[in-house]
Amino acid sequence: MKFEDEPVPGYPLPILPGHTSPGRLERVLRRGAFAVTTELDPPDSADPEDVFRRARIFDGYVDAINATDGSGGNCHMSSVAVCALLARKGYAIVMQVSCRDKNRIAIQGDILGGAAMGVANILCLSGDGVQAGDQPRKGVQISSSFRMWQESRTVMNGTKTSIMQ
């Protein structure tokens, strides 16, 4: 199913001074149009072609692709790597960052790495429980997704270089 780009009364939303995101997802949202995103589960391999093959399925149907972060409590290619690969191919991307099983330094690294690779959209999540995964282990929850969201905003806006202290 394809969605038509129809403007909504009261849109487009103004762009704030100093803001320079030309992203497709942002353009759709600012127009007030219905935005469609989908999740892409990263492969268990290091082969970029596995990522591109999965993304091509959604060509012409979605406004952005969410790269999941350790979905199902399993190990996959990182969300940062998937976003970097897809951005090079021109896809609009949303980097998911899960706070499950990561300490603050790992979360900081993901957010800063994503920003360095051109990621403009982040979805902060608690993450799937480890009981869903394929390895026997105990889950670790260092931070809440809301706290991570608050802190990631400051990093992505360039107002803070160290987060979640």
What is each stretch, according to the model?
Residues 73-96, 141-165:
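Alpha-helix-loop-beta-strand connector modules within alpha/beta enzyme cores
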Residues 91-107:
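Structural motif corresponding to the early beta-alpha repeats
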